Amino acid sequence: MTTPNTGMPIKRKTLEKIIELKNLSKIFGKTTVVDDISLNIVRGEFVTLLGPSGCGKTTLLRMIAGFETPTSGGIYLEGKDVTKIPPYNRNVNTVFQKYALFPHLDVHGNIAYGLKLRKILLPEQEINEKLEKLRQKKSEEVVAKTEERLRTRTRLYTKKEIKAKVNDALKLVGLEDYGHRDVDSLSGGQQQRVAIARALVNEPRVLLLDEPLGALDLKMRKEMQAELRRMHKELGITFIYVTHDQEEALTMSDTIVVINDGEIQQVGSPQAIYDKPANAFVADFIGESNILSGIMLGDNLVKFLGKSFNCVSKGFAKNQPVDIVIRPEDITVHVKKSTKTQLNGKVISNTFLGTFFEVEIEVNDGEYQFTVQTNQNIALDAIVGLEIKPENIHIMAMEATINEIEAEMTAGDWVKIAGKEFEVTPQNDANGEEFGKGDRVTAFIPFDKIELTDDENDGTVGGWVTHTLYKGSYYQVKVWTDNDTLFIINTQYEWDINDRVGIKILPTDIRIQAREDLDVG
């Protein structure tokens, strides 16, 4: 069980933003990788961009760094538009998973490399010394003009300055005595520290870290997580960290930005993301969750698994479909009869995980299988009672209740959806008129009216499974087609992410409506 970072939260609305992303998008070919993202990053925060592989988080980081140019939108660093400014002119540095150290240079040489090329403004002490000498010979008018020129003059670092800065960087990453070492003689963790020192030695405003611990073993990753938190606290600069590892995000971050399919799903503190996920994707991706479908019966009352439960959620419409999240550690198991029991179930597995037992409990004759974390060692096949307190039932509005897909009428009663044509039941627009060729429409297809097949040729449309969510009596599967159309399917069968599938749709299950009618409604 992962414990979120619960350190003092940063009040994001009251602090100065250092980076502002405005309506940022990136399209490669026909694929939208980052889709209209807007985000403010507060100065001094440790921000983690978290999401599954291919969600767009690394592309977003590369655009902030300047290695990718946005298709649209803007990037602002300390209020300045840097969207088209090259990486070397942005005051940010990047640490990659592949360390990219120079094998022909020792540790000191690797860290010093950038310093040797960088020009700096004259230090204040140098300016004052030059002006003091000048005052002994020249008028104040000459001194003032000279000072103006000196304050814009640049020079390279001296060898003494480079040595001092490299030593400071080595000390920061815990490698004080390693300057003379060949980089090939270092362990993976030590090489990563050198890469971090090289990025920090130039004193960037922002440090970008692209899955920097991915190549390390578990023990080394844990150590480096603690080291990065220490460095961040000591330096006080902004860290933007990319990972797909939710444990890293929960334990290291001030703020987590959850990304999926190129869009931000939620922004918040680790505690808020864990306790109050914005949608089913976030709940499923962050930690372990029991996710069910339910109906709101009214304020503080929800129905799922055929029973009514008290909750602490208000403001939903009566009979509104909702997603329900219950964390495994928030369910109490009663091995003896109890008046507090709300559901009865059968233990079908029990695994000891060091500090707790993870128990799978089947309820309602297999309608749903709860994952429960408990300190009780419960026998297999035992019949137990489950208690769920109102404050532990988290209610979320469903992301969608039906597929709504942009489509176009091609001729007569034929409609083009995801690049394929379907002959649908004759339908009229809001004025009672028949649809004509070229009319823009929205196609509505229920989740449970679509069938998936593992033979793409058996389907009408082909696509890739990008997300699978267990919801008890069914799995909810997301499939993106090759022309970037999303279908959500409720199915009895579990599908793996990255499965290539065929999608079967019966024309009789398609309802169409003019898009302008929807806009008016």
Q: Where in the sequence are the language-model features?
A:
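The feature captures the beta-strand-to-loop junction immediately N-terminal to the Walker
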Residues: 50-52
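Conserved ABC transporter NBD signature motif
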Residues: 73-81, 128
